[in-house]
Amino acid sequence: MRIGLYPGTFDPITLGHQDIIQRALELVDRLVIGVAINRDKSPLFALEDRVAMVREECDRIVAKRGGEIVVHPFENLLIDCARDVGATVIVRGLRAVADFEYEFQMVGMNRAMDDSIETVFLMADARRQAIASKLVKEIARLGGDVSKFVSPTVRDALVGRFAR
């Protein structure tokens, strides 16, 4: 069984993330969505909320197109998480050249720690390239409409968070 790991903070999960998830499902038998706890970031949503949102969106994807998705929160090194879930491939989405520079460094470090785990890059769909969780949160914070960037469930969570 080919297991892939798609890691991220998913704060919140966007339509861009969902596009990568759907396409990654075509490449592996099981896709693990690693919801990261990153001490260098201050997430808007608690880990439990992010996991719940990711799980809900992934359940919709599986119901619509099949496949197997597991949502797995993690706090350790990405390469250790990949080993923990039995992944042989790490899936990363790229939106722009700036993403590639960072990802290129990460691949080098991960390969130095375990060269048996491959990294695969999926280019963001042209319609989704501009979507970034950080920008979505800013638009929502300022009262803008984020429905072109996130699902209705995530939109409602953002509206609820900023209505406080």
From Swiss-Prot:
One of its GO terms (molecular function) is pantetheine-phosphate adenylyltransferase activity. Its main location: cytoplasm. It comes from the Bacteria. Substrate binds at T9, K41, L78, R92. The keyword ATP-binding applies. It catalyses: (R)-4'-phosphopantetheine + ATP + H(+) = 3'-dephospho-CoA + diphosphate. Pathway: Cofactor biosynthesis; coenzyme A biosynthesis; CoA from (R)-pantothenate: step 4/5. It is found in: Cytoplasm. The keyword Transmembrane helix does not apply. GO terms for cellular component: cytoplasm. Its cofactor is Mg(2+). The record marks H17 as: Transition state stabilizer. Signal peptide: none annotated. NCBIfam families: coaD_prev_kdtB, cyt_tran_rel. Homohexamer. Belongs to the bacterial CoaD family. PANTHER family: PHOSPHOPANTETHEINE ADENYLYLTRANSFERASE. HAMAP family: PPAT_bact. Reversibly transfers an adenylyl group from ATP to 4'-phosphopantetheine, yielding dephospho-CoA (dPCoA) and pyrophosphate. This is Phosphopantetheine adenylyltransferase. The lineage of its organism: Bacteria, Pseudomonadati, Pseudomonadota, Alphaproteobacteria, Rhodobacterales.
